[in-house]
């Protein structure tokens, strides 16, 4: 039997997965603009393959692709009546790939409906989350992730709804171009408020790359020293004056040249561990190569992963499928060594 997320976190850092919607858009399965996840219904094999890539890279958690799978958001693409089918399919695909190797997280996301002064809007958000959770929990997710909340108030509703399921709850906020929530709360204030509301894991995700989340994460760590801390940054470079990648003119179609290298994401994972982050994952732009390097520095590479080690004593032909005589190559290597 798999250990639950809280048990695993007590044993040390847990490695999450990467981004789904932008990567699937690049592959031709998700529409830019709405970024809704109907791929779980229309092209389940494409989603299954991406889950497999993250699993094989070393991810210990797979998130069901239910981000933006709420009724109102799906209505923007005429799929409001497929909410249950979509949420159910997304969880089943993730669980099938996860098997006994990974945990599966249900997912709630920002709704674009939250209004801080409107009780009716808050009730609508609450009903939206409850509707998705009923399906996801019924399909057997291991815990709930609520993410990408710029409004702390909306994040608190996610905590409230998710806690009623009885499952562990992780909720992360996102900062746009200021180090504040939409209400003007600091990272420390947000983290403490979420923990006090019952969140088991708190932190930050999306919008910003690693370099622009470390400071607020350190503030969170100081504010909630006994809580589990999560980080899931994007894998794109952004300038200091515009850390939110969605505010850049390159979003969403010209982000390729801004993508972080696998080594940069490995450095992020190492730094995150050093400052006390417990759940180390990634978001938009992070693909399996990034997760694999993160797994490497966190010593979480799957046992079956083959590690290629550079050996400058060997010619490149030793690594490529060139048509050559192995004996001849060996003789040349011996001669080269003898000449030294």
Predicted feature residues:
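Domain-level signal for soluble alpha/beta catalytic cores
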Residues: 1-340
